[in-house]
């Protein structure tokens, strides 16, 4: 499943870049993130707890982050499992940060998410609704962090 979202943030690009580069902090802007820790190899491990329809999903996973801060490009590749329900997810999230003439910053997020096992059996409309809700929650929390 693919999702695209564009967020305009009333801050200069340098502020957004600085915030996004603090992965443990910015990860907590995602609704349901319970824990994030940086590993020795520069990747991150964490826990995401989210209710989708009748199921509460507890994903334990790893995220690899590639960034070209000068160009404003970020790529996050994640894989996670919920061993209790026998399912998992993998995703690639691309973010592009761009300074606007107004002085605001545009953050364009493209997400490609694959679900496996029992998670893959959930209906796409249900999953899409939850994914959009989480992206919107992230955007609200990111904006609120500058207030």
Describe the function of each predicted region.
Residues 16-20, 26, 65, 109, ...:
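Hydrophobic pocket/interface hotspot
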Residues 2-6, 43-45, 58-60, 73, ...:
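Intrinsic-disorder/low-complexity, polar/charged segments enriched in Ser/Thr/Lys/Arg/Asp/Glu/Gln
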Residues 12, 41, 70-71, 100-103:
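Short strand-connecting beta-turns/loops that link adjacent beta-strands
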Residues 80-129:
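Beta-strand/loop substructures that line and gate deep hydrophobic ligand-binding cavities in soluble
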Residues 1-49:
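Hydrophobic ligand-binding cavity/cleft-lining segments
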Residues 5, 34, 60-67, 91-99:
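Hydrophobic/aromatic beta-strand elements that line small-molecule binding cavities or substrate pockets
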Residues 140-147:
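Short, highly charged C-terminal tails/helix-capping segments
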Residues 38-81:
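Glycine-rich portal/gate segments that line the openings of hydrophobic small-molecule binding cavities
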């Amino acid at each position: 499943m693919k999702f695209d979202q564009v967020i305009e943030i009333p801050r200069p690009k340098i502020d957004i870049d600085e915030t996004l580069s603090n992965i443990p902090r910015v990860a907590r802007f995602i609704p349901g993130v319970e824990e994030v820790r940086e590993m020795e190899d520069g990747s991150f491990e964490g826990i995401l707890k989210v209710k989708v329809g009748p199921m509460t999903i507890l994903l334990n996973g790893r995220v690899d982050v590639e960034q070209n801060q000068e160009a404003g490009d970020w790529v996050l590749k994640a894989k996670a499992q919920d061993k209790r329900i026998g399912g998992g997810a993998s995703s690639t999230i691309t973010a592009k940060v761009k300074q606007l003439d107004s002085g605001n910053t545009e953050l364009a997020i493209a997400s490609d998410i694959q679900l496996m096992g029992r998670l893959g059996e959930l209906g796409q409309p249900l999953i899409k609704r939850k994914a959009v809700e989480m992206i919107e929650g992230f955007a609200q929390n990111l904006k609120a962090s500058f207030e």
